[in-house]
Amino acid sequence: MGSKIVQVFLMLALFATSALAQAPAPTPTATPPPATPPPVATPPPVATPPPAATPAPATPPPAATPAPATTPPSVAPSPADVPTASPPAPEGPTVSPSSAPGPSDASPAPSAAFSNKAFFAGTAFAAIMYAAVLA
């Protein structure tokens, strides 16, 4: 029972240091910009007289354009006149469901490297130290 309590304590310590390491930094306070003096009123610019008007050049009237010729509306083909196409045949070899490879019976043995309690404790301790350095 004692080793389980130590493991729980280490995990809680890891979570606490991780939470402290990821806490947001305090936001910097914004300093107001220095006050600027109000703009000085400038006198309005002196109005200049408009330039003398020049007479517009005379343009000839546009020539009359002939009206476009109308064409009779075309007749749409009936559905009976449209040929129907057959769907394309599939290309390449066909694979039947029975020839699909099944799951292999021989599965690799699980690794025993991560089941060692000393490895778990060492990893937790290293993580705690890493989080403490970052905090």
UniProtKB/Swiss-Prot annotation:
Comp. bias intervals (Pro residues): 25-76
Main location: membrane
Residue pairs linked by disulfide bridges in the UniProt entry: none
Gene Ontology cellular component terms for the protein in this record: plasma membrane; side of membrane
Keywords: Cell membrane, Glycoprotein, GPI-anchor, Hydroxylation, Lipoprotein, Membrane, Proteoglycan, Pyrrolidone carboxylic acid, Signal
Glycosylation-annotated residues: P24, P26, P28, P32, P33, P34, P37, P38, P39
Extent of Low complexity compositional bias: 96-112
Protein name: Classical arabinogalactan protein 4
Compartment(s) where it occurs, according to its Swiss-Prot or TrEMBL record: Cell membrane
Membrane topology: Lipid-anchor; GPI-anchor
Residues modified as 4-hydroxyproline: P24, P26, P28, P32, P33, P34, P37, P38, P39
Modified sites of kind Pyrrolidone carboxylic acid: Q22
Species classification: Eukaryota, Viridiplantae, Streptophyta, Embryophyta, Tracheophyta
Organs and tissues of expression: Highly expressed in roots, flowers and leaves.
Domain of life: Eukaryota
Assigned protein family: Belongs to the classical AGP family.
Lipidation (GPI-anchor amidated serine): S111
Entry coiled-coil feature ranges: none
PTM annotation, UniProt: O-glycosylated on hydroxyprolines; noncontiguous hydroxylproline residues are glycosylated with arabinogalactan.
